[in-house]
Amino acid sequence: MNIIDQVKQTLIEEIEASIRKANLAEDIPEIKIEIPKDTKNGDYSSNIAMVLTKIAKRNPREIAQAIVDHLDTSKAHVKQVDIAGPGFINFYLDNQYLTDIIPEAITKGDRFGYATQSKNTNILLEYVSANPTGDLHIGHARNAAVGDSLANILIAAGYNVTREYYINDAGNQITNLARSIEARYFEALGDTSYEMPADGYNGKDIIEIGKDLAVKHPEIKDYSDEERLKTFRQLGVDYEMEKLKKDLSDFNVHFDNWFSETSLYENGAIKNTLSKMKELGYTYEADGATWLRTSDFKDDKDRVLIKKDGNYTYFTPDTAYHYNKINRGNDILIDLMGADHHGYINRLKASLETFGVDSDRLEIQIMQMVRLMQNGEEVKMSKRTGNAITLREIMDEVGIDAARYFLTMRSPDSHFDFDLELAKEQSQDNPIYYAQYAHARICSILKQAKEQGIEVSTDADFSKINNDKAIDLLKKVAEFESTIESAAEHRAPHRLTNYIQDLAAAFHKFYNAEKVLTDDTEKTKAHVAMIEAVRITLHNALALVGVTAPESM
């Protein structure tokens, strides 16, 4: 528990004790401690007096006064208590206790803010999972940035996390990919009798694959149609996945598992899943197809598993895959999906319920659309290729750090306009530049301090820190651990980027109000230690969203 949570908990305990001493209530409702929007109303505030009105059958201001009269303020660093408005109890603290966060941050270093105990909860986080049929685009980029940041945050909060990419390598789109490669392969050999499929892939990469295979594997032309298609399927997927993995790796996005859909067919997982569903009585035959009774579990209708022609629907391997995830010992499954998958939520949850699995263990987060904006206008196509703008092009255009940060800044369930020009600006209007510049500025000050013979020390006299802006800055540092916890609990990486902006702003305000290096050696030592704690916090926070913390800019 961090020092702010400790103070809040102590306040709650003392308020509860005061209520009992004043005989206001035997069964005490939940006591909430909030941070007032206006600092004039104290450091913390509680509305418990108004909550107790019906129970105590007294005016809320009278109740508040009774609580204050019986309150022991010695344990929570309280220097003043006021009653405001209809009965709010406002607490003003002696904020010197906040300096305790300085040695803690310095001692813990790159582990500062992280949970010290495991939650003993296994989470499988699946994200990106783009079809291996072409380049990653801006929607995939947002999914990757949010997914990787969320994984980092969950791990920092004490969860056991497995990052997984589901390779869709068994569907019709892969057959179309193989037929497209086949047409380009024979075209490179001078045979134009193999036509591109109507919904084939016409990108330059497919032409290059065809040419490359024609040179390296001329023998493929003599294969049977079935064997040739199988070969092109595998080679096409391998080529696209190699390129995709390189793009993600360069984007600082990594996975523990690359799970192949084909494996579900090869190891019998799909057949076993269907048999289990049938055995449990949740499948039935109608209109020549096999259906799953998902409407028994809040889906709006039942879903087809096997079509009239004997082929599986897309839903069938997805069901087997999610059952497989549960059987691997995962307590919680989190899927990050594109906006076009919204209709999948209830059916996937229902499929797990058929196995007796609580559907609340599956969390599906829908990623809304991103618009790329330049000079106030939407940019839909690449000037270079004439196709949709790729992740690679975005990285080249604005840089990896800016791309990662901007794509994580907003709640995933909200639409987002990515301003390409702003992302490249070297000004305080650019959020990533503003945050990184704060870190670089601190590094510069620490370097100057070292040149003057002043080293970072946890033994500095922190009573020298009494500037209001310094106290505000320490409050933000002290909130880091609870911010990680909140971002993890709500699966909301943007809470961390919001925190980074607030922390950077608090530092810049302090820097503009107070000189760090002065003739007062003891005060300088205290401030140097404090800004090192801020630097560590900024570094750790930026790392959680996959962004570097430069020492100079």
UniProtKB/Swiss-Prot annotation:
Reactions mediated catalytically: tRNA(Arg) + L-arginine + ATP = L-arginyl-tRNA(Arg) + AMP + diphosphate
NCBIfam families listed in its UniProt record: argS
Motif range ('HIGH' region): 130-140
Enzyme Commission code(s) on record: 6.1.1.19
This protein's name: Arginine--tRNA ligase
PANTHER family in alphabetical order: ARGININE--TRNA LIGASE, CYTOPLASMIC, ARGINYL-TRNA SYNTHETASE
Matching InterPro entries: aa-tRNA-synth_I_CS, Arg-tRNA-ligase, Arg-tRNA-synth_N, Arg-tRNA-synth_N_sf, ArgRS_core, DALR_anticod-bd, Rossmann-like_a/b/a_fold, tRNAsynth_Ia_anticodon-bd
Biological source species: Staphylococcus epidermidis (strain ATCC 12228 / FDA PCI 1200)
PROSITE patterns named in the record: AA_TRNA_LIGASE_I (PS00178)
Compartments in which it is found: Cytoplasm
